[in-house]
A protein has these predicted regions:
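Acidic-and-aromatic substrate-binding clefts and catalytic sites of carbohydrate-active enzymes
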Residues: 112-119
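Substrate-binding/active-site clefts of carbohydrate-active enzymes
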Residues: 1-97, 101-102, 122-133
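Structural recognition of the beta-strand scaffold that forms the well-ordered cores
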Residues: 106-110
């Protein structure tokens, strides 16, 4: 995988994360919002670009026989709440699903300064709504 863009393309995709590996951005050095922490892959939560389902999730969900269901639920939720399919909105939806389905009442984040405030706001909104259901 080290240098193979074709192999890395089967992972999240360059619209989803920055990772500094073949086919992915390394981010902007010196900016905590756009630079991977300690070389670890980083979701591009600041991005307003509409994304598709990542290759890794497509493969996983198809193998499990639940691709259509997962995509339909995600798109339905985002659409009915007026959200675009962005990295932040997808990740926030998945985290809020844990709140809705399992009663999770908190998340730990060791690198909060690396996530933009709008993404924290969106996560808060979605999780607060999930608590009401």
């Amino acid at each position: 995988y080290q240098g193979s863009a074709a192999m890395w393309a089967k992972w999240w995709g360059a619209d989803w994360i920055r990772a500094g590996v073949s086919g992915y951005s390394a981010g902007q050095g010196g900016n905590p919002m756009t630079e991977p922490v300690a070389g670890l892959p980083d979701f591009m939560t600041e991005s307003t670009t509409t994304v598709g389902i990542s290759a890794i999730l497509e493969t996983k969900w198809k193998r499990e026989g639940r691709y259509d269901q997962e995509v339909a639920e995600l798109k339905s939720y985002l659409s009915s709440n007026g959200y675009d399919m962005t990295v932040t909105n997808c990740v926030s939806y998945w985290l809020s699903t844990w709140v809705r389905d399992y009663g999770v009442d908190g998340f730990r984040c060791d690198t909060a300064k690396h996530v933009d405030k709008q993404s924290w706001k969106r996560l808060n909104e979605m999780c607060t709504d999930a608590l009401k259901t």
